[in-house]
């Protein structure tokens, strides 16, 4: 199938969803956008989407695929099966790529509901950040049938630099993402703790950042997130509350396996403390603000 004859709707036009949708447009796919935020809808329409809407009723029957990039399982269920859910309007055989971070059990429940409607699910969480999403370079950790992968190949080609086929069982992709989020959350929390200690010890944070990013202690998360701290800019690309949710899923998964997670539990407590202190809607690097007596850079200073 030629790309221009392949129609896809992206539901959830946040930083990752917007990037994925724009990448689909850039790849020549006929692209639709669904979101409750009119500003996001206007932005995607200006980027070349065929149509945008708060729900996809008017164009659902035209779609070959749907990509779900909302925050969690509850939102995924709502946009698919809720009062204004799109699932019942899709034609049989439509592929649904569920990319929200959720527990394996939630992914399996959604898959069962979609199967009952004649729809085909790929359990396909994503990572890489907003910049990579916009360039079509996300990492996708996916599980599902061979048919699901084949039906969604144009979308995967458009949006991803790396696609990992974890297996056929729905829930495997979700579990890999949860383990990944353990590392992501711990890396941010550790980076924040290190920068807070540096500040307390009188080390300029721009100097500390430069040293770490050119030394063995660096990580992708440190380099990406602690730059926000150095700039004093906590405009959210991924919020503190996202990691309250994701590290909660990490701990729930470990609990179900009777498996101890010492570092992840501490990181979860740190993000929860930051959220409780009023920083939940700020960038996740704002977890550094839980440390008292620490002088942090101000934006534009």
Curated annotation (Swiss-Prot):
InterPro entries: 3-OH-isobutyrate_DH-rel_CS, 6-PGluconate_DH-like_C_sf, 6PGD_dom2, 6PGDH_NADP-bd, HIBADH-like_NADP-bd, HIBADH-related, LtnD, NAD(P)-bd_dom_sf
This protein's UniProt keywords: Carbohydrate metabolism, NAD, NADP, Oxidoreductase
A GO molecular-function descriptor: oxidoreductase activity, acting on the CH-OH group of donors, NAD or NADP as acceptor
Protein name as annotated: L-threonate dehydrogenase
A single GO BP: organic acid catabolic process
PANTHER family, sorted: 3-HYDROXYISOBUTYRATE DEHYDROGENASE-LIKE 1, MITOCHONDRIAL-RELATED, L-THREONATE DEHYDROGENASE
Gene designation: ltnD
Family statement drawn from the similarity comment of this UniProt entry: Belongs to the HIBADH-related family. L-threonate dehydrogenase subfamily.
Binding site for NAD(+): 6-34, 101, 245
Catalytic activity from the UniProt record: L-threonate + NAD(+) = 2-dehydro-L-erythronate + NADH + H(+)
EC number: 1.1.1.411
